Amino acid sequence: MIRAGRYGLPLILAIISGPPSRFAPYVELYRRALEQYRRAPLPIGMHSLGYVAGTDEEAIETQWPYWRDQLEAASRERGWRQPTYEQFQSEIAEGSLYVGSPETVATKLAATIRVLGLSRFDLAYAVGQVPHEQRMTTIALYGREVIPRVRELIAAAPDDGNAG
């Protein structure tokens, strides 16, 4: 964070597990470093995993087996414990997995944008070997419904001035 601030580099956080709010101290450190090195404020972005479908149930049901398979493979390679459905549900509820209906994903995304003061968000859509047609549906819903709704939510409840 300090080095990025020192050299005036933009920041994008790859948050793939756990609550995004735990990265707030890093964002603040980056902002302080920009200020200390007399750099102009720069955009801050975030990259996380997600899947958007017509309903929460459809999104969860579709994404779960692909997410599980992807994490099982990574777990075998890295010696991690095997993923569970409870872990999947927890990542959706409080973590950095943006899975659900357009409204659910937009609401969670707007909250994350506010907490971290983000100006950009990169959705790594459809974790695992999700079929092409379902990936295209996620892309369409994200662009047509999620993003406009996020903009509405942000406009309705502006942040506290910390956005980069």
Protein language model regions, located:
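Glycine-rich, proline-tolerant flexible connector loops at the mouths of alpha/beta enzymes
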Residues: 15-18, 124-135
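A conserved active-site cap/scaffold subdomain adjacent to cofactor or substrate pockets
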Residues: 1-17
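An alpha-helical appendage that flanks or caps ligand/catalytic pockets
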Residues: 19-119, 151-164
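Short, amphipathic alpha-helical "lid/cap" segments that border enzyme active or binding sites
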Residues: 102, 106, 136-143
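Short glycine/threonine-rich loop-to-helix capping motif typified by GTGT followed
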Residues: 55-58, 131-141
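A cross-family glycoside hydrolase active-site/sugar-binding cleft signature
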Residues: 12-14, 45-47, 122-124
